[in-house]
Amino acid sequence: SRGIGHATVKRFSSAGWRVITCSRHPFPEDCPWEMGEEDHIQVDLSDPKSTITAVEDIRERLKGGKLEALVNNAGISPKGENGERLSTLDTDLRTWGHVFHVNFFASVVLARGLKAELQAAQGAVVNVTSIAGARVHPFAGAAYSTSKAALAALTREMAHDFGPLGVRVNAIAPGEIETDILSPGTDKIVEKLPL
């Protein structure tokens, strides 16, 4: 609905692809995207039942057809009260679960649920991980970073499992991109970096 996801939708749409979007937000009325509202699914990826319902909705919209690409881009990185990163010492278990459901488990549910449509198209899955999954990051919290590292490992497993079906699975790991996932205090943190 914004950031990398929004840019991805714009890119695929401009290339003539039919794009079915998923977001926790309703489709914005002021969005100029012509097919947007009818091809938008509001879903809470932190809720497994909601995610499964979204898979059923996507399959219904595809009407048993093909799915050329699945881009698993959802990601959340909760911050502390003052915008600071949450570490392993101060992230409560509920937050860990919430982050992993959105950033990791939803990718499994979506890919498995859409396996037949991906196979019919000999399509591709792209999991959006993060550089934060490979190193301690000054902005990204421990749960976010760990979930993105797990998603990178999952990508290898999915490539092994989906490959024989003719479905490619890859990951991209973006670096710093100015999106809403960065906390409001990010500019102050950047000033303190010894670069």
Language-model region placement:
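Active-site helix of classical SDR
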Residues: 111, 147, 155
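Substrate-binding pocket helix/loop in short-chain dehydrogenase/reductase
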Residues: 81-88, 92-97, 189-190
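A glycine/serine/threonine-rich, flexible loop-to-helix segment
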Residues: 31-35, 84-86, 164, 171-195
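Active-site loop-to-helix junction immediately N-terminal to the catalytic Tyr of the SDR YXXXK motif
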Residues: 86, 136-145, 157, 185
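Alpha-helical segment proximal to the catalytic Tyr-Lys
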Residues: 116, 160-161
